[in-house]
């Protein structure tokens, strides 16, 4: 069987969410061709000002064709090293053997602690709290960009923990990144993710950016990009 890997909740780096209609088409293809869809719920925990979209795994007819992959790395901490898989029944034993043979299993104490954290409602409380925090940081970044970079476009603002700032084609994002590094601002160039023709832009993570620092950070961005590129 063939397989396709997707991140429908929040594609990295552009931040797009896969529409329900396209999810349904993908499932129909998987059923018709007896293929698998590997659904990585990357950044699926965080969304802002938009309604949730159904996981592919939860849609009708998905149980035999979708392998759902989730992780606690964004919601709790990457150091916890906990992830989970919801797979078709016919694959579960094979997956268990493969994971155990490679040592890719969670120790019992960590698993039990996380199970209790979920069952007690503490995870839901934590999720709500950190979502409010990230929403405020996102709003501060977007507002600062509107003030200081009014001619650029921000993509991927609906979900996740980063946005993409599109740059004009004649602005080299690698040069902008270098200038930002000199003033202590770390961002990633969008062109580094391109397979063919580079798209100019910056990948901006706001998870660790307090609201009080967003304006200064975006002013540094504007200075590194240069006024000629923004008019």
Question: For each predicted feature, which ranges?
Answer:
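Conserved core segment of the aminotransferase class I/II
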Residues: 62, 68-132
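Active-site pre-lysine segment of PLP-dependent enzymes
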Residues: 16-36, 43-75
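Conserved glycine-rich beta-strand-loop-beta hairpin in the small C-terminal domain of fold type I
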Residues: 115, 133-142, 152-166, 173-179
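Conserved PLP-binding active-site segment of the aspartate aminotransferase-like
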Residues: 87, 164-170, 186-226
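Short glycine-rich anion-binding loops that position phosphate/pyrophosphate groups of nucleotides
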Residues: 8-12, 74, 209
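A generic "structured core" feature
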Residues: 37, 97, 114, 144, ...
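PLP-dependent aminotransferase-like
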Residues: 1-20
